[in-house]
């Protein structure tokens, strides 16, 4: 069963996919979006859902450190509601506190990637971490 993980931001959506058995997550790509123009990347997402035969989604919830909802939680839930309606597939939510920080640390320490290059992959890696945390917790 393939699960797609999403890190939803205001300008990009990081995308990750699980292996068929649901053990590991792999970052796929970053989809550019524009909330002001109501462009949410659903066409590309549909292509990926078909290509990988996705059966469910996991979306990161950007909570505050004190477990209250951060300013982007509502946007993430709204995105999830759209996906559930468009694809008719279940959507789960995963606390994503510190995943972007962890992703950036990994890119600096392990890959020694420059700031400019980090910006190009950070959301994809964050989506991978969100999905991997979900897989570890549920399977």
From Swiss-Prot:
Species for this entry: Streptococcus pyogenes serotype M5 (strain Manfredo)
Protein origin, superkingdom: Bacteria
Alphabetized GO MF terms: nuclease activity
E.C. number(s) listed in UniProt: 3.1.-.-
SMART domains: YqgFc (SM00732)
InterPro entries registered for this protein in UniProt: RNaseH-like_sf (IPR012337), YqgF (IPR005227), YqgF/RNaseH-like_dom (IPR006641), YqgF/RNaseH-like_dom_sf (IPR037027)
Protein name: Putative pre-16S rRNA nuclease
Coiled coil: none
GO cellular component terms, semicolon-separated: cytosol
One GO BP: rRNA 5'-end processing
Family the entry assigns: Belongs to the YqgF nuclease family.
Function: Could be a nuclease involved in processing of the 5'-end of pre-16S rRNA.
Cytoplasm listed as a keyword: yes
Key words of the record: Cytoplasm, Hydrolase, Nuclease, Ribosome biogenesis
């Amino acid at each position: 069963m393939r699960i797609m993980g999403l890190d939803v931001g205001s300008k990009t959506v990081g995308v990750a996919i699980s292996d068929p058995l649901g053990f590991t997550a792999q970052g796929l790509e970053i989809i550019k979006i524009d909330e002001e123009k109501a462009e949410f990347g659903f066409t590309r997402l549909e292509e990926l859902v078909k290509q990988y035969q996705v059966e469910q989604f996991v979306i990161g919830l950007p909570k505050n450190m004190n477990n209250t909802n951060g300013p982007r939680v509502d946007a993430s839930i709204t995105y999830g509601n759209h996906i559930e309606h468009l694809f008719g597939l279940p959507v789960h939510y995963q606390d994503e506190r510190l995943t972007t920080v962890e992703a950036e640390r990994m890119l600096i320490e392990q890959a020694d990637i420059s700031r400019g290059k980090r910006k190009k992959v950070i959301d994809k890696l964050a989506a991978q971490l969100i999905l991997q945390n979900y897989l570890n917790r549920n399977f």
